[in-house]
Amino acid sequence: MKNKLLIFSILILCTSSCNYLEYDESDFLEKDAVFSSFQYTRDFLTNIYSYVPAAFGTIGGDALRSAACDEAVYVDKLSPVHSFNNGAWSAINTLDDRWNYFRGIRAVNMFLQEVEGQEFDELKHNEDYEDIMAQFKYYPYEARFLRAYFYFELAKRYGDIPLITTLLSEEEANMQKRTSFDEVIQFIVDECDAIAPHLPISYKELIKSETGRATRGAAMALKSRALLYSTSPLFNKSGNIDKWKSAARAAADVIEKAWDFGYMPLPDLWSLWNNNYSNNNELIFGVMQREDNWFERVNFPIGIEGGGNTGHCPTENLVESYEMQASGLPVAPDAGYEHMDPSYNSQNPYEGRDPRMYELVAQNGAWWVYDEQVECWYGGRSGKPQKNATVTGYYLRKYVDGSTSLKSEFVTSKRHVWNIMRYSEILLNFAEAMVEAYGDPNYKDGYPMSAKEAVDIVRSRVHVDMPPFPNNLTLNEFKAKLRNERRVELSFEDHRFWDIRRWKIADQTTDIYGVDITKKEDGSFSYKKVLVEKRIFKDCMYLYPIPQSERYINPELEQNPGW
């Protein structure tokens, strides 16, 4: 953690939707000059926002953490993400290294120290001074939210971490010991409680040109997520029921404010990630990308006009988790609970499934852009043995904007919204915490709804229309089906990678399956489930290793067990 106190290099780049800070070594400003200027102070805070990942934690440039769990296989065999799966990562060969969040934390600590009592005297005679100060009053609370978010991202990876809330010298910072995971989570919870009342419900009427900033709901949602993780088996080894109750209460607090905050499950799933941020009533906290076609270039299927590089291939493991729509019953015994739908036909596997599956994958025969069909069968234009063909029999559709053109004569770009927290997650957080705390899916004394009612809201929204959970499920069946619902609803949103760790089931997810598809002489297809990868997972991998480079700098950092 470097200590750079005196100079800042600032280059301001403004767009219609947001403000950025970029550093340029040709321009230098002393610290006092930065924090005596409202413009530079605002840009300093905006730069702290840049530490929030704009895409779900890309590894090696393009791969998502979905390819490091049982959601996907990444087709490029040279991608570093494969080291997650073959056990070739270590404290020296780190992957997804987020220790640099401490830079963001240090920036927050500096920001809070320097802006305290600031009134920007040189602007007091400006006509817009009151508007400026109305914006500025939120800045310290936004910064504290970001610090809490960074600490959560660190804690879920590394467990115990240094907890630093003041600006330290370089020597002091490099002698900090690790604080227990529970203490870090309690700090996050306390911060969220303290800052939430001071943050606005929305910025739409306050600062119309800026979106993606921390709100009251974002602070409350972060508390919900932090408590859910802390009470899960990985971190709650004693099974403390009171922790589950606290997690349920935190999620309930968001649900009870949903109407006031304007949150609701969005019926148009496509709009969750390919729409204007301000029109997304389900989104609680996220990042809007500039217009580009990077994700499409990485993930468009091969073989179609203007095709891409295939990228992420959803697994048969994930596809099997999508139930039959009419019955709500699974198509495989490990997809929820054992009562399978007898009408499911493994040789016509994609008919009548959960509508969310069609938003996730492009399966064999699916229509793609330009009125072309995806041909995943052996010998098809999108299938083996074509170079970069899908290795699982599926292509990724989620987040891919089908209206984007990659044709050489007409290349277009689109905006993407990366959902970091959304309302359906809160409903699922609540359902999980409630059923673990009270052992009854229908219990709701003192709460806005029961676990069953919460999950049924997610399933019953327009354009999903999945049947409610059956009333006759055993407790264990309900829990299994609920975990499957979370897997389905939040697929490719950077949850599954962490869920299988906090539930301590990652060692059960190492067999990765796809389908081999053969086209018959009569034009029909046969489908065969096949093992694609057998991955490696050791107990030490439930937590990341502390980067050895940081331990050389700070000898007080003890390594996580097994690394």
Residues of each region from the PLM?
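Conserved, well-structured interaction surfaces
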Residues: 37, 42-46, 50-54, 76-158, ...
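Long, intrinsically disordered, low-complexity segments
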Residues: 17-20, 98-104, 187, 271-331, ...
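Bacterial Sec-dependent N-terminal signal peptides
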Residues: 1-27
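Membrane-proximal, proline-rich intrinsically disordered regions
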Residues: 18-65, 551-563
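Short coil/turn linking the two alpha-helices of tandem helical-hairpin repeats
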Residues: 153-157, 162, 203, 229-238, ...
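Flexible, polar/acidic helix-loop-strand segments at domain edges
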Residues: 342-423
